[in-house]
Amino acid sequence: SWVGGKKNLRDEVLARFPPYYERYIEVFGGAGWVLFHKPPGADFEVYNDFNSNLANLYRCVRDKPAKLKYKLRYVLDSREDFDLTSSLHKRGILPRLYDVDRAAKFYQLIRYSYASGLESFGSQPHSMWSDFPMIDLAARRLQKVVIENKDFEKLIRQYDRPVSFFYCDPPYFATENYYKDVGFTAKDHIRLRDTLLEIKGKFLVSYNDCPEIREIWDKHNIHIEEISRLNNLAQRYDGGCQYAELLISNYDTIERARAIKQLSLFD
């Protein structure tokens, strides 16, 4: 469960996509909750994440699913094995490995760590074999998806067109320390805003609701919508706990619903 993960909000996010675009770019891909929930269409799709281990994992899922599953067969659900892999990760050794070995070890850290935080063993029994059907489904979904590993500013400038739509789920404000592999700083929130304000296409950004973000995005022609979702981690201790979120865009997020209603008049 990634901090800010969109599993509990993805329907709300998709409902606010613009009615027309030809390029879909997921700038901070993470676990891909929105991409995998988004029906594949004729649009050109890009998944990006600055975490090179994560980008490599998705490339292996897309291009070498059989080899990845073969490696995962031999991953042990044990604290000792997890700690060995975690040590490789902390010492920066994973990028030196063969791509499939690297992907299998990083997936091990995601699957067996507490709250997918990569740090400590989660102690929850889980069979890797049970994930194989999901890996096959993900491989098929990713077949026509471009997978990038770039800084968000370079990516946005590269793919920006009038027909481009960027969905951004950046590290939440004041949670930057959680994303140790990414190095996202307070200044990057400003850099993201400045980059998006200059694009020709459209954007939708998900954020935690806080005064700092509201101030950063208090700009002309910027739409800010309040929304709430279940708090993934707090559910264990406080069932039904809600997490306040903001959806920020350079277009009217209601226009998609309006367009659907207009089309339905002629069905």
Regions found by a protein language model. Name each.
Residues 27-28, 48, 148-150, 168-170, ...:
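Short His-Asn-centered micro-motif
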Residues 29-33, 133-134, 208-211, 252:
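Short, polar loop motifs at secondary-structure junctions
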Residues 185-267:
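Long, positively charged, glycine-interspersed low-complexity recognition regions
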Residues 1-9, 16-19, 55, 62-178, ...:
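SAM-dependent nucleic-acid methyltransferase catalytic core
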Residues 37-41, 139, 157-161, 213-220:
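Short loop/helix-cap segments at secondary-structure boundaries that form the rim of catalytic
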Residues 51:
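Conserved SAM/SAH-binding beta-strand->alpha-helix loop
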Residues 1-29, 33-34, 40:
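S-adenosyl-L-methionine
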Residues 43-46:
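Short beta-strand element of Class I
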